[in-house]
Amino acid sequence: MSKVAFLGAGSFGTSLGILLGNKGVTVSLWDRDENVINDINVNRKNDKYIKDLTIPTNVTAYKDLDEALNGAEYVVLAVPSHVIRTACKNLKGKINDDVIIINIAKGIEEGTNLRLSQVINQELPNNKVVVLSGPSHAEEVSKGIPTTLVASSECMECAEKVQDLFMDKNFRIYTNDDIIGVEIGGAVKNIIALAAGVCDGIGYGDNSKAALMTRGMAEIARIGIKMGGKAETFFGLTGMGDLIVTCTSMHSRNRRAGILIGQGKTAEEAIKEVGMVVEGIKACKAFYELKEKEGVTMPITDIAYKVLFEGAKAENAVSLLMERDKKKEEI
């Protein structure tokens, strides 16, 4: 049976660790927080991130990275997008070339505007990378609620290995070779979810959200295709599927942050109240720069940028979006 090491014992990393542990896989969870490590190893819980769960005994938490990595055939990057590069640097010289890196973070690197698999490839060029993505809230995965994701890689053999690793009766995995499309969909949908939350916070209705999600889907496809993704990917699980769940669920950090912003809070206040990383805010800045560079029209991203970084009022920004020049509906 395989051994899987997770870098990060947050909500999603812990949930996937539980899933694998219940399948009989040996799992190590590396984290810096000694309270989290103690809670997992002593109490078989991780109450800091997910309440009311029991962690199997074959899941062990470590503060020492070398111990966590010992014997691992797979390493799962379960850390926020802005620390992916640091995490990979920490892996240098500690893992063999045949260890498969599985990334579950969704976002883009601030400053370089690189996709996360590109960052991983820069730091760990000899290791194959698989992106595991799709509509999946940790709160539901940890409870065994049926969930379906995509394992995407340039190495289809590696994607199939990850598919076999995670598949069980309540966790279905498809494979996909469009890693660009999968990563772009997973990153941009967080911007649209922020905007959907703003609509909810202002008090707009279902009509508004349906329009925003649909036109948001067009933005995702537009920038994704421009960057080399396949059109069909954006209408699958990692595009439309992830967009739907992130824009509608109260588990969504991005939607919750958007609601608070729509109610008049600043981005900083919203992040503090949510209490966890809100990837859509970083993604908004990155994709605003990318769409300018690539010459792609992304009006929802434009408006989100004005609210998040230029101090525009949410209601005024929505008016700007609605009062743009008339045009034909198209992707």
UniProtKB/Swiss-Prot annotation:
Active site feature: K189 (proton acceptor)
PROSITE patterns hit by this protein: NAD_G3PDH
Family: Belongs to the NAD-dependent glycerol-3-phosphate dehydrogenase family.
Keywords tagged on the record: Cytoplasm, Lipid biosynthesis, Lipid metabolism, NAD, NADP, Nucleotide-binding, Oxidoreductase, Phospholipid biosynthesis, Phospholipid metabolism
Main localization (coarse): cytoplasm
Pathway: Membrane lipid metabolism; glycerophospholipid metabolism
NCBIfam families: PRK00094.1-2 (NF000940), PRK00094.1-3 (NF000941), PRK00094.1-4 (NF000942)
Catalytic reaction(s) noted: sn-glycerol 3-phosphate + NAD(+) = dihydroxyacetone phosphate + NADH + H(+); sn-glycerol 3-phosphate + NADP(+) = dihydroxyacetone phosphate + NADPH + H(+)
Localization terms from the record: Cytoplasm
Domain of life: Bacteria
Physiological role: Catalyzes the reduction of the glycolytic intermediate dihydroxyacetone phosphate (DHAP) to sn-glycerol 3-phosphate (G3P), the key precursor for phospholipid synthesis.
Keyword Coiled coil found: no
GO molecular function: glycerol-3-phosphate dehydrogenase [NAD(P)+] activity; NAD binding
GO cellular component: cytosol
Residues that, per the record, bind NADPH: S11, F12, R32, K106, A138, R253, V277, E279
UniProt keyword NADP, yes or no: yes
Record protein name field: Glycerol-3-phosphate dehydrogenase [NAD(P)+]
EC number: 1.1.1.94
Stored HAMAP family: NAD_Glyc3P_dehydrog (MF_00394)
